Design a protein with these regions (language model features):
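Short, low-complexity N-terminal intrinsically disordered segments enriched in polar/charged residues
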Residues: 1-34
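Short, conserved clusters of charged catalytic residues that mark active-site
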Residues: 11, 72, 103
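Short beta-strand segments enriched in hydrophobic/aromatic residues
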Residues: 20, 32-33, 90-92, 121-124
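A solvent-exposed, acidic/Ser-Thr-rich amphipathic alpha-helical stretch
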Residues: 25-90
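Short beta-strand edge/turn micro-motifs at domain boundaries
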Residues: 85, 101-132
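Short, cysteine-centered beta-strand-loop-beta hairpins and adjacent loop/turn segments enriched
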Residues: 92-99
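Extended, polar beta-sheet/loop recognition surfaces of beta-rich domains
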Residues: 131-141
């Protein structure tokens, strides 16, 4: 596991918030592999087109119009050859308050042009075991 790999993956995660908060669905989708997917609150978006559509959709655009900030916590990254996993917490702020606090488990694949997100699972940290398990899985990796 090289420091360069960890930095590149951390940068991908860090790029998510600014891209999604500016409504740039194409930039969000470009973080993912062509066949990458994102599962948030039980909704699964498969492929770049669906991920971009989520950001461009009315629900997300409404959040942006009211004021929103997606803040990614520092990830714990484990690289194994051309794949990697990371876990982190994220906080979504709405104008004046915390709206959601979540656990994230990301997988990554190394491509000819660099690292891309293969998958992201996001679950609310609301006391449910499923969210805690996302964070716990990485320690066993």
């Amino acid at each position: 596991m090289s420091t360069d790999d960890v930095v590149a993956i951390t940068q991908l995660i860090a790029a998510y918030g600014p891209a999604v908060d500016t409504g740039d669905g194409d930039a969000v989708a470009a973080l993912f592999a062509e066949d990458g997917w994102y599962d948030v609150a039980g909704m699964r978006f498969e492929g770049r087109a669906q991920i971009a559509a989520m950001v461009h959709g009315g629900g997300h655009q409404g959040l942006i119009a009211e004021g929103v900030a997606h803040v990614m916590g520092l990830p714990h990254v484990v690289v194994s050859g051309d794949t990697a996993t990371a876990v982190n917490q994220s906080v979504v702020f709405r104008k004046t308050h915390v709206w959601r606090v979540a656990a994230n488990r990301w997988t990554f694949t190394r491509t000819a042009t660099g690292w891309l997100v293969q998958s992201r699972v996001n679950r609310l940290l609301d006391g449910a075991q499923e969210a805690r398990d996302l964070l716990r899985q990485e320690r066993r990796a």
